[in-house]
């Protein structure tokens, strides 16, 4: 499971350097990949402006986020009208084309993500450690049954297991976890200055790689 205490403290103390004030450059560049889709899944969504951008594009946005602070900030900062509901042991907020579940992503059922055909993942793969990423890949396969496309801007600084969160996600790992069911393509790769904390852990490079996952016909 993600380190909920770590992330909760970050939100509580407003230590959210990972939060962006505008949509991600790769989402802007590749938004038309979603033109034939209607409903998109945004895991560990925080209060990301990416969701506003996706909604303005015409997509119904289904998010999941464990931090109530993040969800309430998202609603307030964007002047949204969303109503709080409860189903099973899950809380969710719905309205204005958004539905955001509050809680553990792995407690969602297939019915909660019915109709979702695409996913924008800027936050979850890099938040999960290696074993959690295995569980997450299985979750997408088992729960998001109609998923055919994923756009994922990820971080890559090699196989440095204890450097995170955010964690490194390599091409080798993605092929092991998703290669059977998805065609994987690098859409862009941006080198970034190697941070000292990563260098001290053995990393020799740091980059942001935007991946496209397209479901194989027989995948």
In which residue ranges do the predicted regions lie?
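Conserved acetyl-CoA-binding loop of GNAT-fold acetyltransferases
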Residues: 59
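Class I SAM-dependent methyltransferase "Motif I" SAM/SAH-binding loop
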Residues: 41-46, 124
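Local beta-strand N-terminus motif with an aromatic residue
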Residues: 37, 115-116, 124
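Short amphipathic alpha-helical interaction patches enriched in hydrophobic/aromatic residues
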Residues: 15, 123-124
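Gly/Ala-rich phosphate-binding loop of Rossmann-like dinucleotide-binding domains
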Residues: 55-56
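Class I (Rossmann-like) S-adenosyl-L-methionine-dependent methyltransferase catalytic domain
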Residues: 1-38, 47-51, 63-98, 102-112, ...
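A short, conserved alpha-helix within the catalytic core of class I
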Residues: 127-139
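A conserved beta-strand element that flanks and buttresses the S-adenosyl-L-methionine
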Residues: 120
């Amino acid at each position: 499971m993600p380190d909920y205490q770590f992330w909760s403290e970050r939100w509580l103390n407003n230590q959210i350097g990972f939060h962006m004030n505008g949509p991600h450059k790769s989402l802007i560049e590749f938004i038309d990949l979603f033109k034939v889709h209607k409903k998109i899944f945004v895991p560990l969504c925080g209060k990301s402006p990416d969701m506003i951008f996706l909604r303005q594009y015409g997509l119904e946005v289904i998010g999941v986020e464990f931090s109530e602070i993040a969800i309430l900030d998202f609603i307030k900062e964007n002047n949204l009208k969303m109503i709080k509901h409860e189903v099973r042991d899950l809380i969710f907020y719905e309205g204005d084309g958004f539905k955001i579940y509050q809680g553990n992503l792995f407690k969602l059922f297939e019915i909660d993500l019915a109709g979702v055909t695409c996913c924008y993942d800027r936050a979850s793969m890099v938040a999960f450690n290696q074993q959690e990423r295995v569980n997450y890949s299985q979750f997408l396969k088992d729960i998001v049954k109609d998923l055919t496309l994923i756009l994922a801007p990820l971080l890559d600084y090699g196989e440095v297991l204890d450097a995170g969160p955010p964690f490194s996600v390599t091409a080798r790992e993605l092929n092991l976890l998703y290669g059977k069911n998805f065609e994987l393509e690098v859409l862009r790769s941006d080198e970034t200055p190697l941070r000292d904390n990563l260098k001290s852990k053995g990393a020799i490079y740091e980059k942001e790689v935007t991946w496209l996952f397209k479901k194989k016909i027989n995948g």
